[in-house]
Amino acid sequence: MNRTGDDETLSTQVKAEVLAEALPWLKQLHGKVVVVKYSGNAMTDDMLRRAFAADMAFLRNCGIHPVVVHGGGPQITAMLRRLGIADDFKGGFRVTTPEVLDVARMVLFGQVGRELVNLINAHGPYAVGITGEDAQLFTAGRRSATVDGMATDIGLVGDVDQVNIAAVLDLISAHRIPVVSTLAPDRDGVVHNINADTAAAALAETLGAEKLLMLTNVEGLYTRWPERDSLVNEIDSAALAQLLPTLEAGMIPKVEACLRAVTGGVPSAHVIDGRVKHCVLVELLTNEGTGTKVVSA
């Protein structure tokens, strides 16, 4: 190997040390399932999307089994606007008419999911896109929103009632990376758009995942947002449940997903900053990690 200067030699040495530091984490996670909720800037910034896809391929080639769950709220909003379809929200949820659902299905599986599958597959034949409709992966239950203290109908919006992981296990056994779009039928076969945070937690719990990672647009969990000194490195489920009512509205579904996962047997859940390139590898394979780690009380 040619060495052209001290800076390059130092850089090479640092890279070797980083790889060596990853060894115990690679051993711990080898053969384990890691569920990753893919959202936020990581979905819209081209550099971050490519880095995320590379992270998934890296994990797969290290013998770790990533499972990706994604939503696509901003992309759905953009397509509805482009098509001139009214977009209404109640209680923080998109009112999903049959017309809006058709757009959501097109965007989630046909656009967001396909783009990520293609980015991962640039590294090898790894990723397979599926939805909650495939092989009855998810069964949805209709949900409502609370507006002014009253339950309000929001259309074809659901929560996860049941999970059938057979198809995902088949993909994992074949060393593929499932990329899951969050659409699911109810017991009568009526398709609903389901919250991706909820879906990721339910899938992690049912798969017996080692970790659940939630990508966000903040550095982690703040107890007093936006005071930077209130960023939490680690918190248990009991303390987090007490903190839940005080959190910003956008963080609540992610925290609820973390709580569901760790109380359901997942050893740890992590809220990490998806704006950071290779944030998944930083969290999983370095001593310092990133974001906030949630564990059971």
UniProtKB/Swiss-Prot annotation:
It comes from the Bacteria. It is an enzyme of class 2 (transferase). InterPro entries: AceGlu_kinase-like_sf, AcgluKinase_fam, ArgB, Asp/Glu/Uridylate_kinase, NAGK-C. It catalyses: N-acetyl-L-glutamate + ATP = N-acetyl-L-glutamyl 5-phosphate + ADP. The record marks 37, 254 as: Transition state stabilizer. GO terms for biological process: arginine biosynthetic process via ornithine; L-arginine biosynthetic process. GO terms for molecular function: acetylglutamate kinase activity; ATP binding. Pfam families: AA_kinase (PF00696). GO terms for cellular component: cytoplasm. Its EC number is 2.7.2.8. It is found in: Cytoplasm. Pathway: Amino-acid biosynthesis; L-arginine biosynthesis; N(2)-acetyl-L-ornithine from L-glutamate: step 2/4. SUPFAM superfamilies: Carbamate kinase-like (SSF53633). Gene3D superfamilies: Acetylglutamate kinase-like. Keywords: Amino-acid biosynthesis, Arginine biosynthesis, ATP-binding, Cytoplasm, Kinase, Nucleotide-binding, Transferase. Substrate binds at residues 72-73, 94, 193. The keyword Transferase applies. The keyword Nucleotide-binding applies. PANTHER family: N-ACETYLGLUTAMATE SYNTHASE, N-ACETYLGLUTAMATE SYNTHASE, MITOCHONDRIAL. Catalyzes the ATP-dependent phosphorylation of N-acetyl-L-glutamate. Belongs to the acetylglutamate kinase family. ArgB subfamily. This is Acetylglutamate kinase. It comes from Mycobacterium leprae (strain TN).
